């Protein structure tokens, strides 16, 4: 649920950011950058900001927070989206009709999962089986490899 800020390549510009996640290690990652829903910014264990995206731009909104007044204040984020992941691994369209019971249960689940209140003994209803864990953006791995190779070349040249 807590995704690391440093595993996203923010250098590509807000419209090209990828927010990658998967349910299991053997799956190709899904890009959640065009998700809609709510998100939380965290500094360690403390939640410092709650926001929403009602158009498909979660990645762009998070990227904006890397440059605004909150930029130095968060190192992790959580998000809760409305667009389902289809069997093809891409985001589908959000449903348009939600019953009151589902909305209330979802609100409770988001509060329980996001705030982790110590007196709640269970997870929020309906959250199991729908959680995706973060996948590091492969471009960051490539950047690390290039930096390592450059350091090795520089140390040999001395």
Predicted region positions:
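Boundary/linker segments flanking structured domains
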Residues: 1-36, 40-48, 54-158
């Amino acid at each position: 649920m807590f995704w690391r800020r440093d595993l996203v390549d923010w250098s590509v510009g807000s419209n090209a950011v990828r927010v990658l996640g998967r349910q299991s290690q053997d799956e190709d990652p899904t890009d959640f950058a065009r998700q809609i829903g709510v998100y939380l910014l965290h500094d360690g264990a403390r939640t410092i900001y709650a926001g929403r995206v009602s158009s498909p731009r979660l990645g762009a909104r998070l990227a904006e927070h890397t440059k605004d007044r909150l930029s130095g204040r968060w190192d992790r984020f959580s998000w809760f989206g409305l667009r389902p992941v289809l069997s093809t691994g891409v985001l589908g369209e959000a449903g348009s009709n939600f019953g009151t019971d589902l909305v209330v249960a979802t609100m409770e689940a988001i509060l329980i999962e996001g705030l982790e209140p110590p007196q709640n003994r269970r997870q929020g209803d309906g959250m199991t089986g729908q959680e995706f864990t973060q996948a590091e953006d492969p471009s960051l791995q490539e950047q690390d490899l290039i930096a390592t190779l450059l350091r090795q070349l520089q140390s040999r040249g001395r």
